[in-house]
């Protein structure tokens, strides 16, 4: 332990919780830049869309993605016949990043007393906030800066009433996803690669069987114990059950998740201050508070995400609508 120049009184040090720290030195050793990347790791882990969508490199001005349209064909010919000509075409999609941000406010005493726990809590809360906002925008278009999202599809099938009449009790969840919904996709030249379902569908899935009498949803053996979602398979397609998919009567989506791309610009940026004045109210009813006057600390976290759904018709909405209850 260091001592003061008089060699008699112990010097507690600038980071000791008993020292009334002020200014930048208050955060020395608390918020290291290398710890910021963990925020993205948590966000990527929690976001269900980011589990299935393709991640692409993203620059500050966006990304132009080339896309091949049309098929190349070949024909059998006889000796001396004119060779057929085939053409293809390339188009591109420009995807722009959008900023997402949040500010955490806590008392300086709390930070000084237990900095490790404060940072851990903040990491979890930031990750959850970012992931939820991203998924809500990508799935349902809620407060979305992105022009495309899954809910824009017009294809729809009910898990509890596959034929939409409420009169055929012999139809099951298997008929809904593996027959009716799949037919909507393949008849339009689309694929079924993955499925997203809300936790609200668990009672529906628990008793569901395939045509061989096996459970329709087979949970992954290697799912993490504390995972924020359940991972498994339906008809050999990777499937996720999570608590923030549903919106109204829509409880899930199945389709070609290769049509989804997302990216992030650089790393996480954060600022720490105890000198600003923040509006802790709303724009309509502001409540401006001086951090310095009230001995508060604010941490601003920002990130830039991009998302694009290339083909909304490659997805089918799964609902819990029952015609007999309408």
UniProtKB/Swiss-Prot annotation:
Keyword Nucleus applies: no
Main location: virion
A Pfam short name: Phage_capsid
Protein family according to the UniProt entry: Belongs to the L5likevirus major capsid protein gp17 family.
InterPro entries recorded: Phage_capsid, Phage_capsid-like_C
Keywords assigned by UniProt, alphabetized: Capsid protein, Virion
Coiled-coil blocks: none
GO cellular component: viral capsid
Subcellular location: Virion
Assembly mode: L5 head shells are composed of gp17 subunits that are extensively cross-linked.
Name of the protein: Probable major capsid protein gp17
């Amino acid at each position: 332990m260091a001592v003061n120049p008089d060699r008699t009184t112990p010097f507690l040090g600038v980071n000791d919780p008993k020292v009334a720290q002020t200014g930048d030195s208050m955060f020395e050793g608390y918020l290291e830049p290398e710890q910021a990347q963990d925020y993205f790791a948590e966000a990527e882990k929690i976001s269900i869309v980011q589990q299935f969508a393709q991640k692409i490199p993203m620059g500050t001005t966006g990304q132009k993605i080339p896309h091949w349209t049309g098929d190349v064909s070949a024909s059998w010919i006889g000796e001396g016949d004119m060779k057929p000509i085939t053409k293809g075409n390339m188009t591109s999609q420009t995807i722009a990043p959008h900023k997402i941000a949040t500010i955490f406010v806590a008392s300086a005493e709390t930070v000084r007393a237990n900095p490790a726990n404060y940072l851990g809590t903040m990491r979890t809360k930031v990750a959850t906030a970012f992931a939820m906002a991203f998924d809500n925008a990508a799935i349902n278009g809620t407060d979305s800066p992105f022009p495309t999202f899954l809910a824009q599809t017009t294809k729809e099938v009910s898990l509890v009433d596959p034929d939409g009449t409420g009169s055929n009790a012999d139809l099951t969840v298997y008929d809904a996803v593996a027959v009716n919904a799949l037919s909507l996709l393949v008849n339009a030249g689309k694929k079924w690669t993955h499925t997203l379902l809300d936790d609200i569908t668990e009672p529906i899935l628990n008793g569901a069987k395939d045509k061989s009498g096996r459970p329709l949803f087979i949970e992954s053996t290697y799912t993490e114990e504390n995972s924020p979602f359940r991972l498994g398979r339906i008809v050999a397609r990777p499937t996720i059950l999570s608590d923030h998919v549903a919106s109204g009567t829509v409880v899930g989506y199945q389709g070609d998740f290769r049509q989804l791309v997302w990216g992030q610009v650089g790393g996480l940026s954060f600022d720490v201050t105890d000198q600003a004045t923040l509006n802790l109210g709303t724009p309509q009813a502001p409540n401006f508070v001086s951090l310095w006057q009230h001995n508060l600390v604010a941490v601003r976290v920002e990130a830039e995400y991009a998302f694009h759904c290339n083909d909304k018709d490659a997805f089918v909405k799964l609902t819990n609508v029952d015609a007999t209850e309408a």
